[in-house]
């Protein structure tokens, strides 16, 4: 694994639509960090690695069927042009679900090379030949991998050193503790007949922490049984040590 260049996370995005970047990554926390050089983003136009007069990047699927498939030779040349040992990721709905654990691991590394699929998908041979890690951001279909790449990078960049103003904020958010977040409130004290829970204005920080944990556990148990089961299993494991 290469070390971070100048201590910066380096993202290379391979796409047919480089004009989509930085997009939302150019504003707010990610945009400020990009402008300050806390991370690096570059794009690679996949079509630049196509050959022939028409510079075709796709072809009809072997065996028939609808749509087109991105060509292995073209994609491989694009990947090889930036291969320096960083993880190679393919954004695809058939990939492993993106988790906060994987996001944090990426943030701790030197960066990532991200391939944005289009059409029906990418020739399986280049996925195998270049050992691409297939990642999904959810069980739904997008027009291409660019939006998914932006989601992944936004999640990663906010964890980089110096990006978030309050480190504790990142450590107490949903998924970092294995739970969904507790409810949040701020002034005014009462709004449309709904008051901020008294415990949050009591000044008793121990009681506040306990209330927040109980609320996070309740919300996780009700909304994400899968996360709740994993959380309980982890607690039993820790308790048994």
UniProtKB/Swiss-Prot annotation:
Principal place of residence:
cytoplasm
Q: Catalysed reaction per UniProt?
A: guanosine(37) in tRNA + S-adenosyl-L-methionine = N(1)-methylguanosine(37) in tRNA + S-adenosyl-L-homocysteine + H(+)
Q: Which InterPro entries match?
A: Alpha/beta_knot_MTases, tRNA_m1G_MeTrfase_C_sf, tRNA_m1G_MeTrfase_TrmD, tRNA_m1G_MTases_N, tRNA_MeTrfase_TRMD/TRM10
Q: Where in the cell is it found?
A: Cytoplasm
Q: What is a biological process (GO) this protein takes part in?
A: tRNA N1-guanine methylation
Mention any one GO cellular component term assigned to this protein in its UniProt record.
cytosol
* EC main group: transferase
* Bilayer-spanning residue ranges: none
Task: Show the GO MF annotations.
Answer: tRNA (guanine(37)-N1)-methyltransferase activity
Q: What is its EC number?
A: 2.1.1.228
The protein's UniProt keywords, in alphabetical order, are: Cytoplasm, Methyltransferase, S-adenosyl-L-methionine, Transferase, tRNA processing
| One Pfam family named in its UniProt record | tRNA_m1G_MT
Q: Where does S-adenosyl-L-methionine bind?
A: 117, 137-142
**Source organism superkingdom:** Bacteria
Q: What family is this? A: Belongs to the RNA methyltransferase TrmD family.
Role according to the record: Specifically methylates guanosine-37 in various tRNAs.
Q: How does it assemble?
A: Homodimer.
* Name of this chain's protein: tRNA (guanine-N(1)-)-methyltransferase
The protein's organism comes out as: Brucella ovis (strain ATCC 25840 / 63/290 / NCTC 10512)
Q: Tell me what gene encodes this.
A: trmD
